[in-house]
Amino acid sequence: MKFLMISSNFFSIFATSNCNLMKKFLFFLTALLCVSLAEAKVSLPQLFQSGMVLQRGKTIPIWGKADAGETVTVTLNKKQYTTVADEHGRWRVDLPKMKAGGPFTMEVKGEEAKSEKLVIDNVLIGDVWLLSGQSNIDVTIERVYPQYTQEIDTYENPQIRLFRVQNSTSTHGVKDDILPTSINWKPVTKQNAWLFSAAGYFLGKRMFEKTNVPQGIIVNSWGGTPIEAWISADSLQRDYPMLVKRTAFYQNDEYVKAQMKANAEANKQWDALLNEADATQDYIRLDYDDTNWQTINQNNWTWRGTGTVWLRQHININKEHARKAARLLLGTLFDQDVTYLNGQEIGHTYYQYPPRRYDIPEGLLREGDNVISVRFINKYGAAHFIPEKPYMLCFGDDRLSQNPMPKDVIPLADTWKMHIGVEMPSCPSGDVSLQNLPTTLYNAVLYPLAPYALNGVVWYQGESNTGNPAPYADYLKKLMGCWRDRWQDQQMPFVIVQLANYDGRQQTGMPRPITYQADPVNSGWAQLREAQRTAAKADPYAELAVINDLGETVDIHPLRKKEVAERVGLCFDRLVFNDKKVSLAPEIISSEVQDGKVVLTIDQPVLAGTLYEFEIAGEDGKFVNAEANADGNRITILSPLASDFSPQKVRYAWKDNPVKANVRSLSGLPMSSFEMVINRK
């Protein structure tokens, strides 16, 4: 610790000149000394908290800050490790490899007598996994609960710890630490996991069952973000300097604050005007006369305005169901809604994606006529119901489950009474969205995590890049490269979760009918899946988790996250634990022409039979559908054209939503979509 050195002559001169000045100076000196003492405290990053999991079998870095030159001692498992803070106050010790175990207590202390000792208890040694990406990592246990009700209700495991990185951005370069978070190494219980990543929860559970050692799950994701936000400036600068310049524009903090304030004020005023013009609450009353309202069918509703629109549906409840607790499933809606039953609000959702699951308290449903009133608030695009979702009242002890669906249900009708509340111009944007700018998330929430020892990384992202898939493979290569550089581990394992199947024509502001895409299309989702496939294939320390059968046609956030975690776990079984017995998704090895037929060789046997979603192209580059059959590890594709047709390329499952794709391994894993030039010997 550094002390202020002030001569006695200085004090005597100061005292004789002015007593009041002397008092002020002593006050200043005391304050300065307090600051000096405060700065002398040894500190640790936010990752280091009680309950944490440290990585087994690898060197364990522990780091933090102290006064420059101060000696810092770290004690773990009754062993001491000492280092000295550098000229910038940074210190680090590397603990030797440890076996799985615990709980242990870790103590960190400076050399000075007044230095506060930091005590971190309940520390486990096991496996630590980092999950990053966008909203499909964000999807919580709360969201998927109806898919796995019994499992989530009953499963607890203090050996699995959950850590959620708090969202933050930086346009001014890298940060030293992340922000404090409320989910800080919490043990797995239903309550602790409720707002935690479902993919992370199930990965921890799966890997614990595999290894029987403690599991630490760090989730670091942000919905809607592109991959560029997660890559370092140094990695982008050479090949994509304009991306770095785009972020530099937002380094003007005053501009950003002014823009955010203006947008927020415009949004606030829009809401105020909306509520002033549509202030009536009469429409929620059971006895309101809606006979003169227009009747619409939710499956072909044509209103295209923005503002508010009211919908009402009467439903008859028999004596058996009257006064019982229930759950209303109102599918998903575009965009916002406030929903009432018999004049009482039962739920609201302020954006389009979450499923509407509204619990009805006991006593609210009455025998006879009841009315559901929905106030749509639509700030842009066209208000609509998302098809293929459940719209019903659910009763009984299993009413919270959707896998299977409850036994006692009353389906809602497709028809509603409709009345326009108020029509408004589209609402202005309320967010500058710094999280979508290149480098901002790498700077703020990725860089500070290193060098915390990890066993592997899950990258589950891509939806926000489907509009421009061409550079994605290179972006992904740069992301894996700069993260490995940051951890100084060029063999850091990555599992890339490929995009699921999805048809986005309904989850947009201008919905279009969902019909099967029978003809070949130039799919942005397929192109991005191909970028993920080729990037993973080119990297010896990466694997691809194929999930093109786990999506939902009308939902960009499919619920089957346990199955996603299982496939990620299989990849880690091979990549990290070197389990040679594990079979992953079938992978295309080669393609060639034999006797006028295109023959594909796969890395393993696949289920035999007729196959779908194959296309071939001739010299003109135009793809056409083709029949295919599987036998062992070979797929034979028959040309649908004339005998002189010369196939040049073949591709598979080349659609946003390739619902008929059916190439599977003998264990049931689906093959990735691909496009390949045919080898012509």
Whereabouts are the PLM-identified features?
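C-terminal beta-sandwich/jelly-roll accessory domains of carbohydrate-active enzymes
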Residues: 80, 603-681
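An acidic-aromatic loop/edge-strand motif
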Residues: 118-187, 218-300, 369-443, 447-452
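Short acidic/polar inter-strand loop motif in beta-rich domains
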Residues: 111-118, 377-384, 654-663
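Ser/Thr-rich low-complexity repeats and stalk/linker segments
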Residues: 41, 49-124, 382
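Aromatic-lined ligand-binding clefts that engage carbohydrates, nucleic acids, or primary amines
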Residues: 63, 293, 315-343, 372-374
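Surface beta-strand/loop "capping" patches
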Residues: 46, 55-58, 303-307, 327, ...
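Short, aromatic- and glycine-rich surface loops/edge beta-strands on solvent-exposed regions
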Residues: 102-111, 373-374, 647-654
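Beta-strand-rich ligand-recognition modules
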Residues: 78-101, 332, 339-392
